Amino acid sequence: MTWQQKIDDALTARRSADALRRRYAVTQGAGRWLVANERQYLNFSSNDYLGLSHHPQIIRAWQQGAERFGVGSGGSGHVSGYSVAHQALEEALAGWLGYSRALLFISGFAANQAVIAALMAKDDRIVADRLSHASLLEAANLSPATLRRFTHNDPQHLARLLDAPCGGQQLVVTEGIFSMDGDGAPLAEIHRAARQRNAWLLVDDAHGIGVTGDEGRGSCWRQQVKPELLIVTFGKGFGVSGAAILCSESVADYLLQFARHLIYSTSMPPAQAQALSAALAVIRSPEGADRREKLAALIQRFRSGVKASDFTLANSHSAIQPLIVGDNARALRLADTLREQGCWVSAIRPPTVPAGTARLRLTLTQAHEAQDIDRLLEVLDGAG
């Protein structure tokens, strides 16, 4: 088989399964409206949960940062790319979330890959929720450690897997809010099972941070859990991009020595760090509380109004509201129908989700209005 045959066969298999991914160039992709091909759609695919991507204070902070620092960092943080803007953001994040240290990364994917690659060795074991994000599971598979998966949100199954003999250290991996199902993990029970067996807990709270908990402190704060490793990302509730690892002083020092994704990557632009500090200020303010309250009301409006007779509505009280339709082709048809009716919705299919669980992944944001939710419900009712 040639290289071209290998590539062609893989693409043909995806097409045959109605699982081929496509990108669409949009004029505007965040916020209430999505604009593509000179047409405006109600946007139910954005992760900009609090509507901060267009917040004037955050935009101005980025502009001022660019005027002061330039548009790039100029290098790795270990060389010349760690600025006072990065330092201020790390210190603010650590204080906000109750950790000794925070380390910034260019993406959540990079943060997850970095911490697992740096910490795990041959005799170690990773025990991950089977629905954990691809970045976590890929990192676990690529690491020298053994990977075991526990049944989704099942602390008892987790405990049994942790009880099996292990020659090294054990790391439990889960998410605060799961990206494709929108449900939350029972973090207190999971952390208890881990602590009783001297295992550490890593929680990726990409979809909870900024959006839930007091001052938007996220899923762990809401459940009064402090994992040894907390990953927060900035492309959802913060409306920007990037990520951070929250940890102890010694773990931060260790990662600065051994996290290759951190050492050998150009750090985020200082202007971005300054914008993120501005986003954090909004999230923690009374305005941030008002935005979370409005989002919660929109989520309740949707769940109360959806007619789920032809769909399986996931048990989610987050901004992620998946409608499980099962068949790939049907999910694509429904997404096309909704777009024809002016609602931009994405069909999510395997391998992103398990086989037979293709879905419409609807996301609600603070930028929506009540009439937008009502329009979505009307279109869904007609499409179902």
From Swiss-Prot:
One of its GO terms (biological process) is biotin biosynthetic process. It comes from the Bacteria. Pathway: Cofactor biosynthesis; biotin biosynthesis. It catalyses: 6-carboxyhexanoyl-[ACP] + L-alanine + H(+) = (8S)-8-amino-7-oxononanoate + holo-[ACP] + CO2. The modification N6-(pyridoxal phosphate)lysine is found at K236. Its EC number is 2.3.1.47. CDD domains: KBL_like (cd06454). Homodimer. This is 8-amino-7-oxononanoate synthase. It comes from Citrobacter koseri (strain ATCC BAA-895 / CDC 4225-83 / SGSC4696). The lineage of its organism: Bacteria, Pseudomonadati, Pseudomonadota, Gammaproteobacteria, Enterobacterales. The gene is bioF.
